């Protein structure tokens, strides 16, 4: 089997080789397919570090705009989309879990993920004007982050035509974002903060805060008693 694939590959032009990789190796769980995926991605990504593991069914658009650090794991079914003139950077020792969706969304957007970050299954992250995730951030499952807010003030115009506002959103180092949290436009998360499961963040959260609810509000500082007591 290996000889057959090697001989067939050597006869292909560049476009056919890319199609061949996508068809044959992207959804194959064998160790050989894993090695071939790594070879392919190393040749097309802006940079791919050492000891990177890219799972089956991963979708990467515009790989020349994407940098992957050392010891990174991108799990099955993840999607990384870098729009033209944007970029995605993933730091060292980071895990992007199953079915995570990263999309810069627009040409001047970007997503920068720091070192030793864990992004949980089913999380969706957009980077319209920039998304910066600090080192050692822990993100649980099914989080949604979109640094964009629709304009809807004109009742005579369709909302879909009114555009919106976008800004860079930052998540400080060592923050913990609970499962099913939604982070909206202006929802910066301070260093060392904890956001409780199911919360909706619509305004900045100060460093070392514990915040919960919809909308999320600070209930205490880490290391201090409950602010309501």
Indicate residue ranges for each PLM-predicted region:
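Flexible, glycine/small-residue-enriched loop-and-beta-strand segment within the central core
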Residues: 59-68, 74-187, 214, 222-229
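Terminal amphipathic alpha-helical/low-complexity segments used for targeting or macromolecular assembly
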Residues: 1-51, 136, 142-143, 149-156, ...
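Basic, gly/Ser/Thr/Pro-rich low-complexity segments located predominantly at protein N termini
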Residues: 183, 201-203, 218
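A short, structure-level motif marking secondary-structure boundaries and short turns
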Residues: 22, 33-34, 53-55, 75-76, ...
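C-terminal/domain-terminus segments
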Residues: 188-212
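Long amphipathic N-terminal alpha/beta scaffold segment
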Residues: 47, 53-64
């Amino acid at each position: 089997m290996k000889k057959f694939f090697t001989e067939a590959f050597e006869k292909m032009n560049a476009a056919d080789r890319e199609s061949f990789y996508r068809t044959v190796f992207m959804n194959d769980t064998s160790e050989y397919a894993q090695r071939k995926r790594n070879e392919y991605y190393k040749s097309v990504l802006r940079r791919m570090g050492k000891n990177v593991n890219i799972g089956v069914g991963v979708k990467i658009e515009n790989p020349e705009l994407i940098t992957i650090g050392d010891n990174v794991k991108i799990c099955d079914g993840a999607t990384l989309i870098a729009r033209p003139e944007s970029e995605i950077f993933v730091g060292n020792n980071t895990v992007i879990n199953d079915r995570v969706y990263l999309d810069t969304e627009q040409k001047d957007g970007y997503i920068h993920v720091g070192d030793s970050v864990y992004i949980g299954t089913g999380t969706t992250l957009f980077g319209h004007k920039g998304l910066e995730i600090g080192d050692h951030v822990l993100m649980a499952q099914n989080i949604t982050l979109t640094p964009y807010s629709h304009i809807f003030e004109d009742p005579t115009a369709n909302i879909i035509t009114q555009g919106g506002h976008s800004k860079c959103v930052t998540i400080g180092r060592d923050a913990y974002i609970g499962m099913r949290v939604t982070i909206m436009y202006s929802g910066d998360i301070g260093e060392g903060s904890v956001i409780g499961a199911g919360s909706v963040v619509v305004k900045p959260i100060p460093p070392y805060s514990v915040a919960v609810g919809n909308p999320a509000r600070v209930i205490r500082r880490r290391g201090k008693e409950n602010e309501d007591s």
